[in-house]
Structure formats: C-alpha cells, structure tokens
C-alpha cells in the first residue's frame, strides 16, 4: 500500500528539507540540548568533511543473518530519530525487528493543560505504532512503562527488565550514553549492562548530541562511528514516520512552547544516512 501524507504533512514537507538558517545558535558550554532553542546548524554539519568520511556500513552488516534487531527507545519517537531508515530497510528485507518503548513520553509538555501526562500516555504510544507501520513494521512496540524524566533513578530496574527480554543473538540499538538527555543516557547505561550480561551486541546512536556538539567535536567517539546510507524508499518511509508524531510537531498553544521536533531536528532526520556508534 502506498504511503500518502495527510494535508498537514504536505505543508511540512518543504520545512523538512529546507537548509538550516545561517543565524542558528551555535552550541556553547552552557547550551541545554533540550530546552534551549536552535543548536549547531545542519549547514555546519554538512560542511564538515569528517561526516562524509565515516566508514559506510549496510543493514546486513549491522544485523547479520540469524540475529534480531532490538531498538530500545527512551521515548516514543526516539526509535525513528535514531534508526528509522535502518528499520525501514530491515523490514523490507524481512529481518526480525523488535522495538521496546521505555517510557510513554508523558513529560514532553511540562506545565501544559492541553497536553497533559494522561493524554500523552494515550497519544504517544499510538503515534509510535503508526510510525512503525510507516516503516513497514506491524508489531507494536513493547511498552515498559517506566517514568518519563526519571530514568536516571530507574536504570537498574530497566537493566533487569532488558535482561529478561534480550538474548545473545540480539543487536541492541539505543541512544548514546553521553547524548545530553538524562533519559537517553540512563537508557544507554541500562542497555550496556544488559548486553554485557546477555552477551548481546550494542550499538549507540546520537540524537540530541547533534544539537550541542560541533563538527569534529572530540567528545564524540568518531573513531568508532560508522554511517548507514539510506536509499530513497527508506528516506521516504522515515519522513512519513516522523509525521506520525503530531504531538511533537505542533507548538503548545497553552504554554507557548515551540514543537519538540523543531526545524533543526527535522533537517537532521532528513539526512540520507544515519550515524551509529557500535560498542567496542
């Protein structure tokens, strides 16, 4: 079945692919990747030769025959921001794929009377299911239902849960352990613990780091990094999967907050590749 964007999605298509504005705020020492506007522009990242020189890897190398891809997403939408293109390629090739949603993303609109935690608990998992269908994955995410915004206090509990869910033939993808978001980092630590104990392989993926890091930033493990090229179908499916997260794409009329997935985040999601940090 062909994937058709909703009218609002068509209006966002141009914004999804425009070049980043020259006036974007540069990352600084005090930059908060979550609450501060702007970040390192996509123009700056595109101008860095190191990004295009990363070793290339294909889906079959990342997830060899006889293994299963497991994506551990701290919040609904992280699975697509991390590896939406990879998931589309794996689904098309018939690979085994499983997504674990650590939280229901109920803390994305703090202080909002429009997007309350109760409403988000209903909406965001539904958005995630729709997004996975766009990628060709029919099995819904397994919801672990931990508390959004408090995973740093729950990473031991999360690690234990993951140990019961993964095995030695799994390739586990999750957010980078120094991504700048406490939930992302706690999830990565839990995944690192669980994969060591279960002898599974771990691949970490930066999400918020693109905001605060600079091209060539020595704080990122570039020596371990690789790049997964995305074909046209994977890019298209990833775009429509992002559009499923309407709660994250709209400004909050109650608080005046801008969309969680702002223009810079969307531009990064439109890249023809995904950058990954396989654990060494």
Where are these regions (language model features)?
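A short acidic, often aromatic-flanked loop/helix-cap motif at beta-alpha or helix-coil junctions
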Residues: 148-152, 210-213, 234-236
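Short hydrophobic transmembrane-like helices used for membrane targeting/insertion
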Residues: 1-3, 18
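Basic polycationic patches enriched in arginine
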Residues: 4, 10-12
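A conserved mid-domain beta-alpha-beta active-site/ligand-binding segment of alpha/beta enzyme cores
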Residues: 214-250
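Short, flexible loop segments at boundaries between secondary-structure elements
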Residues: 199-219
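Acidic two-metal-ion nuclease catalytic site recognized across multiple nuclease folds
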Residues: 278-280
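Active-site beta-strand->loop->alpha-helix modules in alpha/beta enzyme cores, enriched
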Residues: 12, 16-204, 239-246, 258-269, ...
């Amino acid at each position: 079945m062909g994937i058709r964007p909703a009218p609002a999605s068509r209006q966002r298509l141009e914004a999804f692919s425009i070049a980043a504005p020259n006036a974007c705020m540069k990352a600084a020492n005090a930059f908060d990747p979550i609450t501060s506007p702007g970040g390192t522009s996509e123009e700056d990242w595109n101008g860095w030769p190191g990004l295009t020189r990363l070793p290339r890897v294909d889906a079959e190398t990342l997830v060899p025959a006889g293994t299963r891809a497991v994506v551990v997403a701290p919040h609904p939408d992280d699975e697509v921001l991390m590896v939406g293109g990879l998931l589309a390629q794996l689904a098309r090739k018939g690979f085994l794929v499983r997504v674990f949603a650590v939280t229901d993303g109920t803390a994305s609109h703090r202080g909002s009377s429009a997007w309350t935690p109760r409403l988000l608990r209903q909406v965001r998992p539904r958005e995630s299911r729709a997004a996975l269908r766009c990628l060709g994955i029919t099995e819904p995410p397994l919801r672990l239902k931990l508390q959004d915004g408090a995973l740093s206090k729950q990473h031991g509990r999360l690690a234990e849960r993951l140990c019961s869910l993964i095995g030695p033939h799994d390739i586990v993808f999750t957010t980078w352990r120094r991504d700048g978001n406490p939930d992302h980092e706690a999830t990565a630590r839990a995944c690192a613990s669980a994969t060591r104990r279960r002898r599974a392989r771990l691949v970490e993926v930066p999400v918020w780091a693109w905001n605060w890091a600079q091209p060539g930033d020595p704080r990122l493990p570039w020596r371990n990094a690789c790049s997964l090229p995305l074909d046209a179908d994977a890019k298209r499916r990833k775009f429509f999967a992002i559009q499923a997260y309407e709660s994250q794409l709209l400004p909050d009329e109650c608080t005046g907050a801008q969309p969680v997935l702002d223009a810079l985040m969307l531009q990064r999601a439109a890249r023809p590749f995904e950058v990954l940090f396989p654990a060494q």
